[in-house]
Amino acid sequence: MSKGAWSKFPYAEKAYIYTGAALKKNWDRLHRGDAEPWPDDESVQEAWRLYHQGEFQKAAESGLKAGIAGYAAANKATAIYANYLEKDAGRKLALFEEVARRAEEQQKAEPKYPNAYYLHAYALGRYSQGISVVKALAQGLGGKIKDSLTKAIKPTAPRRMKASNTSPRPSSSIPIPPSPASNMPTPW
């Protein structure tokens, strides 16, 4: 993991602190966009708790200590931090590379876990924007992003629709209600 202290989350407030059972109670709302399943492992729960209160560095460290089971929390914390809070361009790219590498490890260990593919694509996409799309395409990143997104979306489409409480839109005249906002902007 990238060395040095990360910038503090500038919007810290009590509403983002989910102590005890509050995290589980709010889980579906907080993870409506990514359909992340509730983790049984308490150390992974703690990593997510830290993520949701904006303690991104601690969340990443906690997720990594939990092993593969904590990679989703570590990767999401790192990717969201890098995208929204890291000011140094070189460090931002290094963080996205870390997420992509860990996501590849997780894909090998858990080949049917959709968020390993989604976070891989997200990290490579943001990395690509940082180095220029032309350079990224020359490195073959476009194909890797497409492959990961295909694997993330295709097998989970019904689950993701259920998680977001929407159904396929048969016509444009049927409104689909927006998801309630979680404590951070979500990338989807």
Model-derived features with residue positions:
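Histidine/lysine/aspartate-rich catalytic loop segments that bind and position anionic ligands
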Residues: 153-158, 162
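TPR/Sel1-like alpha-solenoid repeat signature
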Residues: 117-120, 148, 166, 181-188
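Sparse recognition of residues in long alpha-helices and their boundaries
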Residues: 91, 136-137, 179, 186
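N-terminal alpha-helical interaction modules that lie
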Residues: 1-117, 127, 139-153, 170-176
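Extracellular loop and loop/strand-boundary signature of outer-membrane beta-barrel proteins
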Residues: 132-137, 156
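Hydrophobic face of amphipathic alpha-helices that form TPR/SEL1-like repeat modules
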Residues: 78, 123-129, 187-188
